[in-house]
């Protein structure tokens, strides 16, 4: 599986981008939320990716942040929501917007997205309701987990049974320069208070 792509941005044609990694060009589908934040042609870019295998195609989907990729994966597990619809949702709504929609059970905002009818919107809200806790707010889509300390803390929280959304939220609350052990302890305290 390809989880991350880092390389030179060669082309941008919505919704596709072409990224050169050591002489190999990867064509990646991205939501408009990611497309709008891409650097210029010829600059370095890093995308969190999801590798999608179908009978007729192998596709890469790219996201500027980990929370966007996590949400894309949750969306595409819902019956009736394929990869293209998942991209359309993330193109029209930020991670936090979708979180608020799920918490408030506001299906009308979802039906404004192309490809989402009333029944699909209601199914999406039903499926995501148990996965998104109202006590936990997701980090802004502009934040990215980049440091090795953050990754070590995320891995530890994952090993302790926390899902990606909870772990990313907790790490996003930590102060800069925290050690791995202190970060794990602080994250556990935050997560226990949020439940």
Curated annotation (Swiss-Prot):
One of its GO terms (cellular component) is Holliday junction helicase complex. The keyword Protein biosynthesis does not apply. GO terms for biological process: DNA recombination; DNA repair. Keywords: Cytoplasm, DNA damage, DNA recombination, DNA repair, DNA-binding. Residues 145-195 are annotated as: Domain III. It is found in: Cytoplasm. Residues 1-64 are annotated as: Domain I. Residues 140-144 are annotated as: Flexible linker. InterPro entries: DNA_helicase_Holl-junc_RuvA_I, Hlx-hairpin-Hlx_DNA-bd_motif, NA-bd_OB-fold, RuvA, RuvA_2-like, RuvA_C, RuvA_C_sf. GO terms for molecular function: ATP binding; four-way junction DNA binding; four-way junction helicase activity. Residues 65-140 are annotated as: Domain II. Its main location: cytoplasm. The RuvA-RuvB-RuvC complex processes Holliday junction (HJ) DNA during genetic recombination and DNA repair, while the RuvA-RuvB complex plays an important role in the rescue of blocked DNA replication forks via replication fork reversal (RFR). RuvA specifically binds to HJ cruciform DNA, conferring on it an open structure. The RuvB hexamer acts as an ATP-dependent pump, pulling dsDNA into and through the RuvAB complex. HJ branch migration allows RuvC to scan DNA until it finds its consensus sequence, where it cleaves and resolves the cruciform DNA. Belongs to the RuvA family. Has three domains with a flexible linker between the domains II and III and assumes an 'L' shape. Domain III is highly mobile and contacts RuvB. Homotetramer. Forms an RuvA(8)-RuvB(12)-Holliday junction (HJ) complex. HJ DNA is sandwiched between 2 RuvA tetramers; dsDNA enters through RuvA and exits via RuvB. An RuvB hexamer assembles on each DNA strand where it exits the tetramer. Each RuvB hexamer is contacted by two RuvA subunits (via domain III) on 2 adjacent RuvB subunits; this complex drives branch migration. In the full resolvosome a probable DNA-RuvA(4)-RuvB(12)-RuvC(2) complex forms which resolves the HJ. This is Holliday junction branch migration complex subunit RuvA. The gene is ruvA.
